[in-house]
Amino acid sequence: MSNISTDLQDVEKIIVLDYGSQYNQLISRRIREIGVFSELKSHKISAAEVREVNPVGIILSGGPNSVYEDGSFDIDPEIFELGIPILGICYGMQLLTHKLGGKVVPAGDAGNREYGQSTLTHTPSALFESTPDEQTVLMSHGDAVTEIPADFVRTGTSADCLYAAIENPDKHIYGIQFHPEVRHSVYGNDILRNFALNICKAKGDWSMDNFIDMQIKKIRETVGDKRVLLGLSGGVDSSVVGVLLQKAIGDQLICIFVDHGLLRKGEADQVMDMLGGKFGLNIVKADAAKRFLDKLAGVSDPEQKRKIIGNEFVYVFDDEASKLKDVKFLAQGTLYTDVIESGTDTAQTIKSHHNVGGLPEDMQFELIEPLNTLYKDEVRALGTELGMPDHIVWRQPFPGPGLAIRVMGEITEEKLETVRESDAILREEIAKAGLDRDIWQYFTVNTGVRSVGVMGDGRTYDYTIAIRAITSIDGMTADFAKIPWEVLQKISVRIVNEVDHVNRIVYDITSKPPATVEWE
């Protein structure tokens, strides 16, 4: 399966060299928010390769290394001679100092180790234009610059950092010891904007509107008169890919939508009505609910459930694809976060590139990934720009195995229905309360636990439904959402009154870690 990726070679860009910082993606995203395309590159990139990429600016990221240690991440020194503006952040500043003849020592030796917010005091500089002379920044460094290279000047200090900002304005090389990409640095975005627009002279015209035009042109050139196959799940990513491809190549796109009977309430109809109706996507629907449920009968182990569903999805998709003729391309909703490891090689940023949907590698298609340069928030913005409604663009994350992993133990139609109906009530009430954009993810779980209850004059022995709602920034860590009690009460009352075989509601107040977001 060969791969045809998004080509943004001609787009004005700032590259971020990856030195292992946990904030690498954040730097790239902040630059994009300013209106300049940005992507991560390996710190091993050569000066010749940088010339080929032709960026308007280069950012050296932070990282966990010390520049004076053997094996620390390095840089091709010829990059400093290219005449391209450079901004070194934290480790990036220490690295450029070290390579250009300055001195870096363990901060403990210099008595100026810094972690947390600090007050930066700066002198006039293009980098700090239109920001206060004193401002709050986030410091996070165990080493410190004690001597700066020749022809550099100091432009910033803090209480514990003699050289918090340095620069060689003639060569357009800048270094800052703090992290402007995080919100704790109050004027960080202004500093990055000054670098991108004033120092690098970028136009700041990167937008989803431009991206759509470029992608449509690229897709048409790549596909020609051939047909493209897309596995449509109804999720945000595959839906946006579908609408974008439809806009580019019309009926040359064929979508396969596998309804495995494990979707949320009304989801299958919504996919067909909205994407097939309003947007005119050519959708082949595979009604495979009985096939999946038969395979899952008697299975309680969550990993076994996942494996069965994954394998069966491949079989169903392959069955449907084999009926189609003259299909040359397979489209996928792969995002930039899925493929970052192709441009970087530090342990902190490697993320396994996944073959979305688990499709077999021996399928004879060329791969098209129109979103593989975009972050999730940009995909949502793209969907909005394409005219897609909020209820699709802002759809909740949904696991590939669907409701199967929100039913503890063996899956039955009865259990699935309790989750499907209770989840619909939860989503409706969260939206009514205006909390749907504040909560990262929310859903219900059939715990598989039955308990005694009283309804009317009779005794019941029915299922316990758990509500899971979390707040998060990146999904790596999470806290339970502090939903107002009156909203929870309304949700609880509605579920026990409107959903059969349920007599008890509990609220999951566990953070991640120790718990995961999903129960299985």
UniProtKB/Swiss-Prot annotation:
> What does the entry list under GO cellular component?
cytosol
Coiled coil regions, renumbered to chain? none
Domain (GMPS ATP-PPase) spans: 206-395
Q: Does the keyword Ligase apply?
A: yes
Q: Which reaction does it catalyse?
A: XMP + L-glutamine + ATP + H2O = GMP + L-glutamate + AMP + diphosphate + 2 H(+)
What's in the keyword line of the UniProt record?
Answer: ATP-binding, Glutamine amidotransferase, GMP biosynthesis, Ligase, Nucleotide-binding, Purine biosynthesis
Give the residue spans that cross the bilayer: none
Specify which residues bind ATP according to the UniProt entry for this protein. Answer: S233, G234, G235, V236, D237, S238, S239
Any Pfam family the entry gives: GATase
Record-annotated Glutamine amidotransferase type-1 domain positions = 13-205
Q: Which InterPro entries match?
A: Class_I_gatase-like, GATASE, GMP_synth_C, GMP_synth_GATase, GMP_synthase, GMPS_ATP_PPase_dom, NAD/GMP_synthase, Rossmann-like_a/b/a_fold
Which Gene Ontology terms cover its molecular function? ATP binding; GMP synthase activity
Q: In which pathway does it act?
A: Purine metabolism; GMP biosynthesis; GMP from XMP (L-Gln route): step 1/1
* Enzyme Commission (EC) number: 6.3.5.2
* Protein role: Catalyzes the synthesis of GMP from XMP.
Per its record, how is this protein called by name?
GMP synthase [glutamine-hydrolyzing]
Q: What is the lineage of its organism?
A: Bacteria, Bacillati, Bacillota, Bacilli, Lactobacillales
List the gene name. Answer: guaA
